[in-house]
Amino acid sequence: MSETAGKGVTMPEIMQSSYPDETLYREKDDSIRPSRLDDFIGQEELRENLKVFLNAARDRGQAMDHTLFYGNPGLGKTTLAQIIAAELGVNLICTSGPVLERSGDLAAILTNLSKHDILFVDEIHRMPITVEEILYPALEDYKLDLVIGQGPAARTVKIELEPFTLVGATTRIGLISSPLRDRFGIISRLEFYTPEELSQIILRTSRILNVPITKKGAIEIGRRSRGTPRIANRLLRRVRDFAAVFGSATVDEELVNHALQKLDVDEKGLDQMDRKLLTVLIELFAGGPVGIKTLAVACSEEVRTIEDIYEPYLIQCGFMKRTPRGRMATVKAYKHLNLTD
């Protein structure tokens, strides 16, 4: 990378890049996800336990117990569902809670499952209660109870289902009803990743996308990726764009720093919205405490977006804390933003 580009003084002419055509990137994006458990990086304890459950299911020749993954977005819940299906050599049928509006929608999916298939339901906490209720006998006895007709002529029909495994994913496990949650034999939480684990993921992705990157460059991206592989891979792709424009053959630490500065991602991984949340909390509400709804209105953001996307990382980093009276900024947040307490 040129000295001028590194300082961000002027944009160079767009140079002929040595990187492959962008269509090749799009074709390779689908292969970023690991397909085997041994290729999955991070979540060590969960991974070791899952290996035991998979081997036990294979040895018994039975469907694996119903599994619920929960944790913040982008930590690998969908990837693990795909890995389970690949490891067991069965089909993976994917849907999501909001899509299943009527019980008939779920019944149609369940009756078409083959033996030991995996049914993956993302955002399972958003599944309507009427749909959820027909799942109970399906999960316990592999039977479907359907009501045909109306009024006095209505009758119940039992349909036998093939043994299957339900894999649910949620960012809000507290919104799943107890009857449904209790029917999962395996419940696993996905934690944020360490910068070292994220750097390994970035190095793996860079090999798949044919983007040469130094170890220091990968570590720097990992350090700013909010503990989330999805964000790490997204930042790598954006840094790749800067490398292509500047004609850099290799993504190094200098280029990463320049690109992330342009993308407004600071050394702690906070973006513009993270800093806005903290700044509003400090400057408008004297650091808090303030209710989440009031904070959301002040930031022109939805409550759920703050709770699911921004708040978990800010709390984990020690920039924000929850109290019975509302959210508060910490001393660490004041120092990070160079504001006076």
UniProtKB/Swiss-Prot annotation:
Subcellular location per the Swiss-Prot or TrEMBL entry:
Cytoplasm
Q: Where is this region: Head domain (RuvB-H)?
A: 267-341
Region of interest (Large ATPase domain (RuvB-L)), residue spans: 4-193
SUPFAM superfamilies on file: P-loop containing nucleoside triphosphate hydrolases (SSF52540), Winged helix' DNA-binding domain (SSF46785)
Residue positions annotated to bind DNA are 322, 327
Question: Where, by residue number, does Mg(2+) bind?
Answer: 78
Residues annotated as region Small ATPAse domain (RuvB-S)? Answer: 194-264
Q: Which Pfam families match?
A: AAA_lid_4, RuvB_C, RuvB_N
Give the UniProt keywords, A-Z.
Answer: ATP-binding, Cytoplasm, DNA damage, DNA recombination, DNA repair, DNA-binding, Hydrolase, Nucleotide-binding
Could you name the domain of life of the organism this protein comes from? Answer: Bacteria
Q: Which GO terms describe its biological process?
A: DNA recombination; DNA repair
Q: State the similarity comment.
A: Belongs to the RuvB family.
Q: Which NCBIfam families match?
A: PRK00080.1, ruvB
Spell out the subunit comment: Homohexamer. Forms an RuvA(8)-RuvB(12)-Holliday junction (HJ) complex. HJ DNA is sandwiched between 2 RuvA tetramers; dsDNA enters through RuvA and exits via RuvB. An RuvB hexamer assembles on each DNA strand where it exits the tetramer. Each RuvB hexamer is contacted by two RuvA subunits (via domain III) on 2 adjacent RuvB subunits; this complex drives branch migration. In the full resolvosome a probable DNA-RuvA(4)-RuvB(12)-RuvC(2) complex forms which resolves the HJ.
The name of this protein is Holliday junction branch migration complex subunit RuvB
Query: What is the native source organism of this protein?
Result: Lawsonia intracellularis (strain PHE/MN1-00)
What lineage, starting at the top, does this entry show? Answer: Bacteria, Pseudomonadati, Thermodesulfobacteriota, Desulfovibrionia, Desulfovibrionales
